[in-house]
Amino acid sequence: MRYFTAGESHGPRLTAIIEGVPAGLSLSAEDINIELKRRQGGYGRGGRMKIESDQVEITSGVRHGKTIGSPITLNVTNRDFKNWEQIMAAQDVEDKIKKQRRLTKPRPGHADLVGGMKYEFEDLRNVLERSSARETTMRVAVGAVAKKLLHELEIEVANHVVNFGRREISSPEHLSVQEIRETAGRSDLSIFDESQAEDLRTYIDQIKKAGDTIGGIIETRVEGVPAGLGSYVQYDRKLDAKIAGAVVSINAFKGVEFGLGFEAGKRPGSQVMDEIIWSENKGYTRSSNQLGGFEGGMTNGEQLIVRGVMKPIPTLYKPLMSIDTESHEPYKASVERSDPTALPAAGVVMENVVATVVAQEICDKFNSDTINELKKALVDYKKRLSEY
Ligand SMILES: Cc1cc2nc3c(=O)[nH]c(=O)nc-3n(C[C@H](O)[C@H](O)[C@H](O)COP(=O)(O)O)c2cc1C
């Protein structure tokens, strides 16, 4: 299962093509729209989120509510395009139109300057339009398909925010996907402990008032994953590495940890490894899950615990200094639009990106021409594991 995304932030539409989804999987536009809506919510978001109410149009690969094995094309219209038709036109336009919304003041922390240098652009809008986090809409759309597939296989994924800037959100060590959904899933801050919500809102409002932004840490958990996805035999088959790469590919994500994560570097080994136990009904399990469900680049059958750190949103209403690329004069960086934080939305992106990698791995490992074939292969595999 592989995919591509395309589309500019203010272009006519965003597109994703997914290939390799098993035939026979029930899939509707509504399945995807639910996830798109989640990405657009969350405390601290404004502006464009109110303009756009994303709706997907499926234009290939699905017939009468079921996938047919051919590439699935997903389209999301940018409703704002009507105000950008000439500026974003594919055909050549008059010079005076080219000057409208031209960007020559690169924003620190964005792709603007380096992208312009790399691709020889005079108008840095060519960079902004594609490097914008608007692209994550399609990662969520693809993830929605992946989650639908995983759900059929009784594999579930959820996320919650564990840090907003300096504010740590308390949550128990043992946390099921169901519990995350019932708590963080109902919170506009995407947090487990609702008693911290009021303080957090005040904190975010203060950051906004100061024209500043905050980042944080998001945790995604995956349940129902059998042992043995990924492999130790080659560097590029290690599933933890694939997940880490996918998470860092999300705009503004700068690091990933599994289980104890960086804390593992500070503890002696006796306080890090998970002891192996065996029982008649469960087979091999671990007495704890400090390694976050991975050993040797493979899932070990425990819950996957992945955390990603998101840097603060780089566009500040209290703009940072930059250099105008035409005049080389110092200038205050342009503000296209910005929010104090996008953590709850970024959590939805992360959850869907992790789901996509797990679904890809499953489709690679097992016969996956049809969903029935895949289900059967997984049942047989789990049976084999239980007899080991
Ligand atoms: C869900 C989400 C929403 C984002 N919203 C904004 C935003 O409103 N303004 C902004 O400047 N950056 C936003 N970003 C981050 C930028 O897209 C990102 O920092 C930038 O493209 C540079 O990429 P890098 O941080 O990965 O180096 C957002 C990121 C995510 C994941």
From Swiss-Prot:
Cofactor note: Reduced FMN (FMNH(2)).
Residues holding NADP(+): 39, 45
HAMAP family given in the database record: Chorismate_synth
Name used for this protein in its record: Chorismate synthase
Gene Ontology annotations of biological process type: amino acid biosynthetic process; aromatic amino acid family biosynthetic process; chorismate biosynthetic process
Quaternary structure note: Homotetramer.
UniProt-listed PANTHER family: CHORISMATE SYNTHASE
Key word Lyase present: yes
Classification via CDD domains: Chorismate_synthase (cd07304)
Listed InterPro entries: Chorismate_synth, Chorismate_synth_AroC_sf, Chorismate_synthase_CS
Reactions catalysed according to its record: 5-O-(1-carboxyvinyl)-3-phosphoshikimate = chorismate + phosphate
UniProt keyword list: Amino-acid biosynthesis, Aromatic amino acid biosynthesis, FAD, Flavoprotein, FMN, Lyase, NADP
Family the UniProt entry places it in: Belongs to the chorismate synthase family.
Enzyme class (EC, first level): lyase
GO cellular component terms given for this protein: cytosol
GO molecular function per UniProt: chorismate synthase activity; FMN binding
A Pfam family assignment: Chorismate_synt
SUPFAM superfamilies in the record: Chorismate synthase, AroC
EC number: 4.2.3.5
Cofactor: FMNH2
Known role: This reaction introduces a second double bond into the aromatic ring system.
